[in-house]
Amino acid sequence: MSHSVTDSTVLLGHGSGGQMMKRIIDEVFLDAFGSPELLEGNDAGVAALPASGRIAMSTDSFVVSPQFFPGGNIGRLAVCGTVNDVATSGANVRYLSCGFILEEGYPMDRLRQIVQTMAETAHEAGVSIITGDTKVVERGGADGVYINTAGVGEVPTGVALSGANCRPGDVILVSGTLGDHGIVIMSQREGLAFSSTIESDAAPLNHLIADVLAAAPGTRCFRDPTRGGLASTLNEFAQASNVAMEVDEDAVPVRPDVQAACEMLGYDVLQVANEGKMVAVVPAEQADAALSAMRAAHYGENAAIIGRVLPLAEGARPAVRVRTGWGSTRILDMLVGEQLPRIC
């Protein structure tokens, strides 16, 4: 019996290695992604090495629940997350791989929508999906669809970004409002309704990073504050660089509805996940240039300078503190435990 992707759901045969698998690859994945390397049909995508001789590579797996949410779906996350991770090295992101684990019975129209979103987001980021894999597990063996992506980029000569580069006197910037993605996922999962529409911030930020590096070549580091939010990112920087950091709470951009939701749920917005924001640490003399570049870039219009890097007091441990609007300070710790499982 011949099957095709006119089937309304994913079947075990779509992962069999036979005719059904070839059809889902050809008619769902290749039709959407269609890079020359992928269309060759080999077990590996072959790509040119950069002239600089250095590459950056990252991989990430995506299990978000729900898989569709305001502002995106698991496919957009799968591209943006890995593109942004590679881009934090200062690399020009070039190629992605993608691996799908599909549950038997998953609706085919939803899979097509996810794949099409991935193709559109990859195009927006200027990257090619050059290799991939598909597996199908029995009903109950997965929750619909899981996606793994890996990315490769070319690191320009002379670029050496690292969370260990932060120095006292440096300035901390963020590219936009915090907490949007985490609150969207929580509201969708728990059936919470808000008076305004909050959308995930999932976005590819490789072009924004390139613009900031061009304007502020002394930039120390970038990082996307995903799980654990800004709190985890800054604590990681402080520990890697053996410094202290101070954040001006009033300077941190947060949507009023997101702030209200965090207060209602008992969350610290600085610990809530983001999927389309970037944290940068730059020398003080380049801070204005970096901020202008962020605000001029797509997805950076709400960028702000939010804090500074401080020297450690004698005998003190690396730490992050927040200066509140009341003039007091509090320690900003990394998230303890799991605030919201399957956020990405």
What label would you give each PLM region?
Residues M1-V28, G315-R317, T329-L340:
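N-terminal amphipathic/basic leader segments beginning at the initiator methionine
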Residues L11, Q19-V174, I185, F194:
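Glycine-rich phosphate/pyrophosphate-binding loop regions near the starts of catalytic domains
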Residues G41-N42, V272-K277:
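Short Gly/Ser/Thr- and Asp/Glu-enriched loop/turn motifs at secondary-structure junctions
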Residues E103-G105, I198-N274:
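Active-site-proximal betaalpha loop/short-helix elements
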Residues A160-A210, A231:
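Short, acidic (Asp/Glu-rich) active-site segment that either coordinates a divalent metal cofactor
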Residues V282-D288:
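Helix N-cap motif at beta-to-alpha junctions
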Residues A289-Y299:
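Short amphipathic alpha-helices in soluble, non-transmembrane regions
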Residues A297-C344:
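Acidic, Ser/Thr/Pro-rich beta/coil linker or hinge segments at domain junctions
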